[in-house]
A protein has these predicted regions:
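PLP-dependent amino-acid enzyme catalytic core
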Residues: 1-340
Length: 340
């Protein structure tokens, strides 16, 4: 069972594994509220995921460690598991969807893991990881629906409360729900008056639909530039914790996410991946009731492939009206281009 004590224990265990990312004020982001950023894009491995995987692996039995670990991931959990497993001298195998950014794939290998590329999206990688677990007797490290993983992610909530106890609202992206489950449990346990909001991509609203239906819902297809939250179905544990602790969930479009990524680059000199920028997008485009409030947006990661980043920047420029694309029909005869 997830408790505040477990999250505090995770914080103690992880103190020499992770770095504490200090909250920074994001001036010029929003005129109606005070925006602060919890920059987990500056975390070791470039993402919050190392917190959950690090704590989970630290709690394995010697027999479980000896079998080696296997995980599935859109990229960030992969790096967290690879780093933590290598730290504890454990063999690791990671299944990634074949659409995962090359930067995340290479980083996972560099942290010491063997990588298995799987056709499809996260859920396909998940199924392949389960198959290999059964075939080769690995210990499976779930990316979000595990209480030790959730407790590790919850250490972010403790750090926010230690650094900014007067915060009014905390905003997190939601894919499978591990991050917001841990953060919301910590925040609400320490101060139930603080609002906790979740943000999903419009093209991958699995938690939104699950809350509407009263049970975890599986979406047939998902599509978003925010690959870190491109999940077809939330976890059973995370679904229950979101119902219990999270005040509301909103969705943002890929154009809005692109604009938030661009805003972070220009105003904060900070690189965020799509999932990391989603909370800021929700604030920027007035999706949340935070006028006049102190708001912490968790920038969950910064592992965005440079080729994707260039397209996202262009999309953000188009969204904000700073770049235009024109289509002109010309007759196929000499002199037409000169005339234009």
């Amino acid at each position: 069972m997830l408790t505040l004590d477990k999250i505090y224990h995770a914080s103690y265990v992880l103190k020499d594994v992770i770095r504490q990312t200090n909250i920074v004020q994001a001036r010029g982001i929003c005129d109606d509220c005070d925006v602060y950023l919890k920059p987990e894009n500056l975390q070791i491995t470039g993402s919050f995921k190392v917190r959950g995987s690090g704590y989970k692996i630290s709690q394995l039995t010697e027999e479980e460690k000896a079998r080696g670990v296997i995980a599935c991931s859109a990229g960030n959990h992969a790096q967290g598991v690879a780093l933590a497993a290598t730290k504890y001298g454990i063999k690791s195998l990671i299944c990634l969807p074949d659409g995962a950014p090359i930067s995340k794939v290479e980083a996972t290998k560099n942290y010491g893991a063997e990588v298995c590329m799987v056709p499809g999206v996260y859920d396909d990688a998940y199924n392949e990881a389960l198959r290999l677990r059964d075939e080769k007797n690995y210990t499976f490290i779930h990316p979000f629906d595990d209480e030790n993983v959730i407790a590790g992610q919850g250490t972010i909530g403790i750090e926010i409360m230690n650094e900014m106890p007067d915060v009014d609202a905390v905003v997190c992206a939601i894919g499978g729900g591990g991050l917001i489950s841990g953060v919301a449990c910590a925040i609400k346990s320490l101060n139930p008056n603080i609002k906790v909001y979740g943000v999903q991509a419009e093209g991958a609203p699995s938690m939104v639909e699950s809350i509407k239906n009263g049970e975890p819902v599986h979406l047939d297809s998902v599509s978003t530039i925010a690959d870190g939250i491109q999940v077809k179905e939330p976890g059973e544990h995370t679904f229950e914790y979101v119902k219990k602790y999270v005040d509301d969930i909103v969705t943002v479009s890929d154009d809005e996410i692109s604009s938030a990524i661009l805003k972070l680059i220009e105003s904060q000199k900070m690189i965020a991946e799509g999932a990391g920028a989603a909370p800021l997008a929700a604030v920027m485009f007035n999706k949340l009731p935070v006028k006049g409030k102190k708001v912490v947006c968790v920038v969950s990661g910064g592992n965005i492939d440079v080729t994707i980043l260039s397209r996202v920047i262009k999309r953000g420029l188009l969204m904000t009206g700073r770049q235009q694309t024109f289509c002109v029909e010309l007759q196929d005869k000499p002199g037409q281009l000169v005339a234009v």
